[in-house]
């Protein structure tokens, strides 16, 4: 099981190797990435409050905290800006297989809303699997999804996204099976539930759909 303490160490090692950041500064930046004002604040957590990355699906680094630490720490070597630095850290966590989920780069709710758009839904939801029952009775091939609306709601416990769209297909004209429809109206409910401090989230996805009659 990978614990957050190992994650902090992994981030610190990456910063030291990639940017030649001194150890004490690397620990402060790692803590900021994970949502802490300081490394001491991170260490103050009891063991029961430290989360395993196995229980987290999505990371949203604390960009504001990281930006402030970069401004407040003296004698840092040349570094990427806080956004790129967060992206580089996230890429390394994935490369080292410390974390395998999405790392979303968003400083506030407005930016997060733009990230959790139809492109994110398309990358993280396979409609062929989610709507397999409707597809099975349609006698059609499906492969084109169009999102009509994407609505975003944020609260203390996390964020929710509700989307609607059409999964478009084509009836197999060479088949002697009847055409029961080649369009599925679908709805998606995605929730990112806050699990660890302000950066770790559990993702749940629910998809429903109804085959549109061709008649």
What feature does the model see in each segment?
Residues 1-90:
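C-terminal alpha-helical interaction appendages
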Residues 60-215:
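Cystatin/cathelin-like cysteine-protease inhibitor module
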């Amino acid at each position: 099981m990978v614990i957050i303490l190992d994650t902090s160490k992994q981030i610190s090692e990456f910063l030291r190797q990639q940017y030649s950041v001194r150890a004490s500064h690397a620990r402060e930046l790692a803590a900021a990435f994970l949502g802490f004002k300081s490394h001491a604040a991170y260490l103050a957590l009891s063991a029961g409050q430290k989360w395993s990355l196995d229980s987290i699906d999505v990371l949203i680094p604390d960009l504001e905290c990281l930006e402030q630490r970069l401004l407040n720490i003296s004698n840092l070597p040349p570094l990427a800006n806080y956004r790129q630095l967060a992206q580089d850290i996230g890429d390394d966590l994935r490369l080292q297989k410390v974390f395998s989920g999405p790392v979303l780069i968003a400083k506030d709710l407005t930016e997060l809303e733009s990230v959790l758009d139809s492109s994110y839904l398309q990358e993280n939801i396979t409609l062929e699997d989610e709507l397999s029952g409707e597809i099975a009775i349609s006698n059609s091939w499906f492969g084109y999804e169009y999102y009509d609306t994407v609505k975003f709601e944020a609260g203390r416990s996390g964020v929710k996204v509700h989307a609607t769209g059409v999964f478009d297909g084509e009836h197999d004209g060479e088949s002697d099976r009847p055409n029961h429809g080649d369009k599925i109206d679908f709805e998606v409910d995605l929730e990112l539930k806050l699990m660890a401090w302000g950066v770790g989230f559990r993702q749940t996805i629910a998809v429903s759909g109804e085959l549109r009659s061709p008649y």
